[in-house]
A protein has these predicted regions:
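Feature activates predominantly on carbohydrate-active enzymes
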Residues: 2-184, 195, 201-218, 357-360
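Extracellular carbohydrate-recognition regions
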Residues: 436-459
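Flexible, acidic glycine-rich loops studded with aromatic residues
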Residues: 266-273, 279-442
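Acidic, contiguous N-terminal accessory segments
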Residues: 1-36, 253-262, 271, 406, ...
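Conserved small/polar residues in nucleotide/adenosyl-binding loops
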Residues: 464-466
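Active-site neighborhood of glycoside hydrolase catalytic domains
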Residues: 178, 183-272, 279-280, 285-286
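Active-site beta-loop-alpha junctions enriched in small/polar residues
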Residues: 48, 77-81, 153-157, 226-228, ...
Length: 466
């Protein structure tokens, strides 16, 4: 007989995950007492640059829950990061550069909205999550005891906003020797502060408020705020105002920590704000704690993956340095970037996570699939899960770990494998039973023209069935 006792529903749920994992081997008699060291065990996915389909998100959540991860941050808008590549060798004027990049650089906003600019530009990208899909994702996350955190990134990384409102493009001086075209992804906080703030809030209102709001039901909202190269004082004012806006809705604000790189006199209230510590140059973790913030260790080294297909492992590489993360990282440990090792018992250190950034799009497109992205998430997730749970009985090094015999969570199928019993064959005489595009029946068989596809009840079909 197996008896499960827990103080909360989440505790009982995690006990069942343990039993499922033990079921991969032989169950033994005994008593298990299990609890996490940190309350936040997270993953950040960039679906703003590279759209990750709904079914892949479901597989990610199922596997997070299986490994007792409980926070999924979805980076829902962003743009090609190396914007100046678009104008190299073109010898354009400064205004010509801005116009060219605004028109041609790839950007994404992945939430269904009806926001359209006076110029006819839609805020929402062609590839996006519908309102129903987002509500299903939020509902599933709650069932799996995962905190689903949508991120809408402004005032930088905001090309999708500027395309709709080009009049709100930043016109002021740029810091950090940034190229002129960086402005197309920056909102104007100098000359049009009130207009910019009102526009951004109006978008958030559509996302969060009302029966048809696609993100209704979330408890934490990430407002972005990283890598803005305009005025520090106006930036600080904007961060403060957006934090207060989210708090006034009864929600928990989360941001990318950046005040160390943006010093100034303008106060920013960080009490109760969750701060992603991603770069020690942008944000000192001790300074964030001193301001009352709850910090999350998602330091770029060793937790960032920037998929490129090279199979490399390391800082900003195809795979994050998951071995270094396991061996030398914990939510309270920032020494991988020569930062401090803080007391793990500090209540303002709520946990840590890892991230997959899809920077390689547009002129750097790699052709990687959503399953390729899943693999990079999954490889680091095992290190994140163990180091944020924090058991003192875990293997001391990555090499000493015992690999699970069943890699993926029950009910998940990230590889989209098909049982032999479910296989079928499409023949010229049966093609009419499927929704076919640019596929023609000929005397020699089936002829596939450019952009051809076949769709059946199981979705898109591959050539293995033909």
């Amino acid at each position: 007989m197996i008896t499960v006792e827990a103080a909360t529903n989440a505790g009982a749920f995690y006990a069942t995950r343990t039993l499922l994992q033990l079921g991969e081997n032989n169950l033994q008699n005994g008593e298990i007492r299990d609890f996490p060291s940190f309350s936040h065990r997270g993953f950040m996915l960039d679906t703003g640059r590279k759209f990750i389909p709904y079914d892949t998100l479901v597989d990610i959540m199922l596997n997070m829950a299986y490994y007792k991860m409980n926070d999924l941050q979805l980076h829902l808008n962003d743009n090609y990061i190396v914007l100046n590549k678009h104008v190299e060798g073109k010898h354009l004027s400064q205004q010509g550069e801005l116009d060219y990049v605004l028109k041609n650089a790839k950007t994404g906003f992945r939430v269904e909205t009806d926001v359209v600019g006076d110029n006819g530009e839609k805020l929402t990208s062609k590839e996006h999550y519908t309102k129903d899909e987002l509500q299903q994702i939020i509902s599933l996350a709650k069932d799996l005891h995962i905190n689903l955190v949508p991120e809408i990134d402004t005032p930088g990384h905001a090309l999708s906003f500027v395309k709709v409102r080009p009049d709100l493009m930043y016109k002021g001086p740029l810091s950090a020797n940034k190229h002129n075209v960086e402005r197309v992804a920056m909102l104007d906080l100098d000359n049009k502060y009130e207009e910019t703030l009102a526009f951004v809030k109006s978008v958030y209102d559509k996302l969060l408020v009302g029966e048809n709001a696609p993100l209704r039901g979330v408890s934490t909202v990430h407002i972005g705020t990283d890598e803005y190269y305009g005025s520090p004082e106006n930036y600080r004012r904007y961060v403060h105002d957006m934090i207060q806006y989210i708090k006034d809705k009864g929600l928990t604000p989360r941001i990318w920590g950046s005040l160390t790189a943006k010093p100034g006199k303008t106060p920013v209230d960080w009490n109760g704000v969750e701060v992603d510590i991603w770069s020690l140059g942008w944000q000192n973790p001790q300074a964030a704690i001193a301001k009352g913030a709850k910090i999350i260790n998602i330091l770029d080294v060793p937790t960032y993956s920037v998929p490129n297909g090279s199979n490399s492992q390391g800082p900003y590489s195809d795979y994050a340095n998951y071995e270094l993360q396991y061996n030398s990282w914990a939510p309270n440990d920032f020494t991988a970037r020569r930062g401090p090792r803080l007391e793990a018992s500090n209540p303002n250190i709520i946990g840590g996570g890892h991230a997959v950034w899809n920077d390689n799009i547009d002129l750097h497109e790699t052709g990687l699939t959503s399953f390729d992205i899943f693999k990079r998430f999954f490889k680091s997730m095992q290190s994140t899960a163990e180091r944020t749970w924090g058991s003192d009985r875990a293997a001391k090094t990555y090499a000493d770990r015992i690999q699970p015999t069943s890699v993926y969570a029950p009910r998940s199928n990230p590889e989209k494998t098909i049982e032999d019993s479910d296989l079928f064959t499409i023949k010229p005489e049966t093609i009419k039973e499927y929704l076919a595009k640019n596929v023609k029946k000929t005397e020699a068989g089936l002829n596939f023209e450019k952009d051809s596809s076949i769709e059946g009840l199981v979705g898109d079909l591959s050539l293995i069935h033909i």
